[in-house]
Amino acid sequence: MSKKIMLINAIDPEVSRMAILENGKLLEYNIQMSAKEPITGNIYKAVTLKVERGLQAAFVDYGGKRPGFLPLHDVSPEYYADREGGGERHGGRPTLKPGQEILIQVVREQKNQKGAMLTTYISLPGRYLVLMPNRQSTGVSRKIESDADRKRLMAFMEPVAREEKYGFIIRTAGMHRNKQELSRDYDLLTRLWEGIRE
């Protein structure tokens, strides 16, 4: 009579291992990774928990398992506490206030005991452009090396760059697109951003 044994190792929360032995011989061995949705690039409404001046960073609750890490140099001036009055300046740098609501984007997933790396400088990738709502700078992807192409693309977007308050970068996918296609992508991204802000 054969004797089957199933062994399961689920010590690691990210990986489960299962083996089936029959009479001491391995019949089957399976490894299953936990299905985890990547969150890099996601945008969340968050609350500042604590500002650590020594680290020049804030810890932020964005709904993850542990608070995220937000370096103060990655905080857009629109969130500086002293804009609303009563905020502090430390070492010539404005800081956030605990309890302050902010919009953040995940730059790097949390690893081991470290929380996710965050920024308030949001970037929204579109088909032909990347919208940067917290910045006023405009540009063309470095991968587009031809000066003629770079000038042509910036000429297409010059009226938008003058009128609008949002920065953008024209992606390599936008290289052979016309003014209408680039403007349409820009309009779509600005509507998306305004919807996120509401």
Predicted feature residues:
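Single-stranded RNA-binding surfaces
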Residues: M1-E198
